[in-house]
């Protein structure tokens, strides 16, 4: 049974000014530090949904990812914050947000480091499956921690939900952005990665994952669907994409040349 713990933020430590989403380092009531992703930032709850779904798929594929937790942000939190931009972000993020366990001492992955071809292939497969456009040489979104490769930041995935139409067509796209993937040159075992993914992913897994999405992350002003209908579209997207994985696997192979 898939599950996430829920913690409450006790202390805002500092902003992590990466991209436009202004994540932050914060301490929670379990005394651990988390990289906090805010519902009031950038693409809002859709980014959190991408992070949640992508993170759980990452876990199930057996890849290393910091623990994901739901994070409560109290209405009074951040009132003493001097930076107005950050204060506005905290105010607009009252309620349930998402956090990733902070890997203290980790370093950004250097593309020159040799890694196992199957591991590289699984990560490329993951990103092609969830349509994550943001694991490039410019921004690897990979960390080395305790001599192991960790996957972070899946918030730029499932980008079909920004237009929210023709999800069936979107689920069968070849994902041309794979050509920019930082690990593509090392991904020499894409067929094996595809086989592995089909062994561990299935409808039951997808149903459990979409059921993790909090109800209030599905109250969209720009969609006519109910929260349950939105959940169902995410489920159908993943189900269809897995059934047609050869489309994006072939695209990745062709991009490798």
Could you describe each region identified by the protein language model?
Residues 1-257:
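Phosphate/dinucleotide-binding and metal-coordinating scaffold of catalytic cores
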């Amino acid at each position: 049974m898939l599950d996430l713990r829920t913690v409450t933020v006790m202390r805002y430590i500092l902003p992590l000014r990466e991209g436009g989403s202004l994540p932050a380092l914060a301490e929670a009531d379990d005394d651990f530090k988390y990289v906090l992703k805010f519902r009031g930032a950038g693409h809002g709850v859709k980014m959190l949904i991408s992070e949640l779904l992508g993170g759980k798929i990452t876990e199930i594929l057996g890849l290393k990812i910091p623990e994901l937790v739901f994070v409560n942000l109290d209405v009074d939190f951040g009132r003493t914050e001097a930076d107005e931009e950050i204060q506005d972000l905290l105010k607009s993020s009252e309620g349930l947000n998402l956090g990733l366990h902070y890997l203290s001492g980790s370093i950004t992955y250097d593309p020159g480091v040799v890694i196992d071809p199957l591991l590289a292939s699984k990560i490329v497969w993951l990103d092609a499956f969830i349509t994550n456009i943001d694991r490039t040489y410019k921004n690897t979104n990979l960390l080395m921690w305790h001599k192991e490769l960790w996957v972070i930041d899946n918030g730029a995935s499932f980008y079909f939900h920004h237009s929210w139409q023709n999800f069936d067509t979107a689920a069968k796209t070849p994902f041309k952005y794979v050509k920019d993937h930082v690990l593509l040159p090392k991904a020499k075992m894409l067929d094996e990665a595809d086989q592995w993914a089909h062994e561990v992913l299935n409808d039951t897994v997808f149903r459990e994952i979409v059921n993790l999405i909090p109800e209030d992350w599905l109250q969209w002003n720009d969609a006519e669907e109910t929260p349950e209908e939105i959940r169902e579209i995410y489920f159908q997207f993943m189900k269809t994409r897995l059934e047609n994985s050869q489309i994006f696997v072939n695209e990745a192979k062709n991009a490798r040349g």
